Amino acid sequence: MDMETQHKEGIVNKYEYIKEILPEDICFITSQDLENMYPDLTPKEREYKIVKLKGAVFIMQIGGKLASGIPHDGRAPDYDDWSLNGDILVYYPVLDIALELSSMGIRVDEDSLAKQLELAGCTERAELPFQKAILEKKLPYTVGGGIGQSRICMFFLRKAHIGEVQSSIWPDDVCEKATEKGIMLL
C-alpha cells in the first residue's frame, strides 16, 4: 500500500464525514484526444467532463494549439516542453469542479524552446540570458512541477474554501460570504 493510500484511508477512517472518492487508477489522456472527445466544449468544460467521468486524470501535452486552433490552456513557451508536460486533476464533489492538484513537465531543451518561441510568436525572447543559455546548450536538461499542497489538503479534508487550510488575509466580502456559509477561514 502506497503512502497516499495509507494517508487517505487514515483520514477516511478518522473522520466519518469523509467518504472515499479517488478511483484506483488514473486516466491518462492527451489534450488533443480530450478535444476530439468533446469538440463542442471549452477546455475547462472538457476537464470537468472527463474528471466527472473518470475521477482522476492526467492531461498530457498542454500549451500548443490543438486541431481547433486553440490551446488547451496557456503555457509559457520557454518553460515546459508542450509535448512532455501535463496536469493531474481530480473530481471534487464538495464544489462540483475539476480540481488541479499538480502540474509537471520536462523543461524545454534547445529544440523545443526554438520551436515553441516560433509558435508563440515571441522569438525575441531567444536573446534573453536564460533562453539564450538553453539554446546554446549551456544549461542542463531539467524536469519540474509543483504540487498544490493547499489544494491537496482541501481535497483530503473536503473543505469548500482554500482559506480553511491556508492562512491568508482575505477581503471583507470574502470573509462575509464565508461566514454566511458557515465556513471558518484561517
Report the location of each language-model feature.
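Extended, charged alpha-beta segments that form solvent-exposed binding/catalytic grooves
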Residues: 1-45
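A translation/RNA-centric and nucleic-acid-associated enzymatic feature enriched
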Residues: 28-186
